[in-house]
A protein has these predicted regions:
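Cytochrome P450 I-helix active-site segment
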Residues: 180, 184, 204, 240-247, ...
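Conserved cytochrome P450 K-helix E-x-x-R motif and the immediately C-terminal K′/meander segment
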Residues: 71, 76-95, 99, 397-449
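C-terminal, well-structured subdomains that either form a transmembrane helix-short loop-helix hairpin
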Residues: 343, 347-357, 362-364, 443, ...
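Conserved cytochrome P450 K-helix/beta-meander segment immediately N-terminal to the heme-binding cysteine loop
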Residues: 462-492
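Cytochrome P450 heme-thiolate monooxygenase catalytic core
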Residues: 136-144, 178-363, 379, 384
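Conserved, non-catalytic sequence blocks in retroelement Pol enzymes and Pol-derived host proteins
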Residues: 49-51, 173-177, 297, 403-410, ...
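Cytochrome P450 heme-binding "Cys pocket" and the immediately downstream C-terminal segment
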Residues: 374-376, 497, 514-545
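N-terminal membrane-proximal hinge/A-helix region immediately C-terminal to the signal-anchor transmembrane segment
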Residues: 2-148, 153, 158, 162, ...
């Protein structure tokens, strides 16, 4: 009887385990089918309203269409290339349209939420400038491991406005110009690193990853600018801070779906993210504490770094909270201090992330274009000879003595802006709202012109990469023509269109750090382009790998 009872108990235990598991699985499947049906119906409703969309299936949505569209791209190609593929193939994808549609509704559920991508700069201005939609939940979700969403990018409303106002002085032209000697020192190291890799006596050096070099430069510059500390990443002295930052970024997921959820929920990933955050916090907290101690001693002294501004803003916020609560007990103070540190670390981390990742990519594309277009490179070198003097290796000393010379390089700035048009970083993602509609701009063709285009339940994506290659707005968009940014006559076909250039987004939530990017890129050109010849060597790189 006892043995029989034990076997019955085991069977009963298994049954008790499997039954609720089966119920949970059934509920999840029912929820997934229900969600999928709702998403697919959402797109069918667009068709019923007469809004042109790509060929859509109630079973696969746009998965088959998008799959074919991106099949020619490398497996690790950035998602931005999808919008370029849509623009390039619009006649096949939208046979009912007479011109490229201003927006494309995309249904790739369950891999991504429903999206509407703006392919037209005038449409993008509607949700970033005329009315600034809130950031997409996914954009906040991806930052959480790095910032706990205590950062300017994740904030909304009054809190965002207060922080934007507090931090803006740190990115003003005056502040950034005052830091030119510091940044020159880091960019000078960039030139020295490239020199160490160059060949001798007119020979080519060994092949290397230029993106690695620009990434290390961007890390050194951003940390020097924000913390006033030299990291020497360019010389291979990888710090715990930079290792933790880059490892965290490599483990970020914008969309969590059936293709990556195992990796996303992997306990090792979460342990590494926790450990990386502790490393970042432990490294940055002393800098925050030093500034706080200095502020307590003398509040009249204003610092020059981002940390200074963050601490000053948090100190003012803390003082205001004390006045409002009239509660100065020790427990409350300790609690505020913990929040203080979390907010400070969150703000710093988001700027470290945004400041190096996009800048490194910008510099890599910039130098590639320069050496693809020798006539542009020749004009650039000529401008540098004229303004900075004929000694290419002495340009750093010239700029230390007279930083304002950087403002006398109009062609250099035009080259940068055209490079950022030609190869554009990721556009802003916003969250659609009930009652907010995009409106098809004049001339956008049947089905779009003047029509209300719903955003509720959609991620609204500024497809600036595609918009920058819109032949309706940009004359000769497939050509690299820096001269277009020197033209002042609005009647000239090359004149940049209003709202057309969106590399830093536009509107109240445009990139707060754009002046720093301008400075770093102009310095990189000023100190490098006359010193080296550079070419792509993919075959040699493949052999080396």
């Amino acid at each position: 009887m006892w043995l029989l009872g034990l076997q019955d108990d085991g069977s009963s235990l298994l049954t008790r385990f499997l039954r609720p598991s089966g119920i949970v699985l059934a509920v999840l499947l029912m929820h997934a089918f229900r969600k999928g049906y709702q998403v697919r119906k959402k797109f069918q409703a667009l068709k019923d309203e007469g809004i042109p969309i790509m060929k859509h299936s109630m079973i696969l949505g746009h998965l088959e269409v998008v799959g074919k569209l991106v099949s020619s791209l490398p497996s690790d190609a950035h998602g931005d290339y999808m919008m370029m593929k849509i623009r390039e193939n619009w006649r096949e994808l939208f046979p009912q349209c007479t011109k490229c549609p201003p927006v494309a509704y995309i249904d790739t559920w369950p891999f991504t939420p429903p999206m509407v991508i703006s392919l037209n700069a005038n449409v993008s201005s509607q949700f970033t400038q005329e009315h600034s939609l809130p950031k997409a939940h996914e954009q906040k979700h991806v930052l959480y491991p790095l910032t706990k969403n205590q950062d300017l990018s994740s904030m909304e409303g009054a809190k965002w406005r207060a922080w934007r106002k507090s931090l803006s002085p740190g990115f003003s032209v005056q502040t950034i110009t005052s830091r030119i000697p510091d940044i020159v020192e880091e960019v000078e190291d960039f030139a020295k690193v490239l020199k160490s890799k160059a060949g001798k006596d007119g020979e080519w050096g060994d092949v290397f990853s230029f993106e690695t070099a620009t990434t290390n430069l961007a890390l050194d510059v951003i940390i020097r600018f924000f913390l006033d500390v030299r990291m020497n990443e360019q010389w291979g002295k990888s710090s715990a801070l930079c290792i933790a930052l880059q490892d965290t970024i490599s483990r970020m997921y914008f969309f969590v779906n059936i293709a990556n959820f195992i990796h996303y929920y992997n306990p090792w990933r979460h342990f590494k993210l926790w450990k990386n955050y502790r490393t970042l916090a432990n490294t940055l907290t002393p800098a925050v504490q030093r500034r706080m101690d200095a502020l307590q001693k003398d509040r009249s002294v204003k610092g020059k770094t981002l940390v200074d501004l963050i601490v000053q803003a948090l100190d003012a916020e803390k003082a205001e909270q004390k006045v409002m609560t009239q509660d100065n007990n020790d427990h409350q103070a300790a609690e505020l201090d913990a929040n203080f540190v979390t907010m400070a670390i969150g703000q710093i981390n988001t700027f470290l992330f945004a400041g190096f990742d996009t800048t490194a990519a910008t510099l890599s594309w910039l130098f590639r274009l320069l050496y693809q277009y020798p006539e542009v490179l020749a004009k650039l070198r000529e401008e540098h000879d004229t303004v900075l003097g004929p000694d290419a290796w002495g340009a750093a000393d010239v700029l230390r003595r007279d930083p304002q010379l950087l403002n006398q390089l109009p062609y250099t700035l035009a080259v940068l802006r055209e490079s950022m048009r030609y190869h554009t970083n990721v556009g802003s993602m916003r969250r659609g709202e009930p009652g907010f509609f995009l409106v098809g701009p004049p001339g956008s063709g049947p089905g779009f012109e003047g029509k209300n285009l719903p955003t509720d339940g959609f991620i609204v994506w500024d497809g600036n990469f595609a918009a920058h290659h819109d032949p309706e707005l940009w004359h000769r968009p497939g050509e690299f023509l820096p001269e277009r940014f020197l033209i002042t006559d609005p009647q000239d076909p090359l004149f940049p269109p209003p709202n057309g250039w969106r590399s830093f987004s536009a509107g109240p939530r445009n990139c707060i750090g754009q002046n720093l990017v301008y400075l770093e890129a102009k310095l990189a050109m000023a100190l490098v382009v006359r010193c080296f010849d550079i070419e792509c060597a993919w075959e040699k790189w493949d052999l080396k790998k």
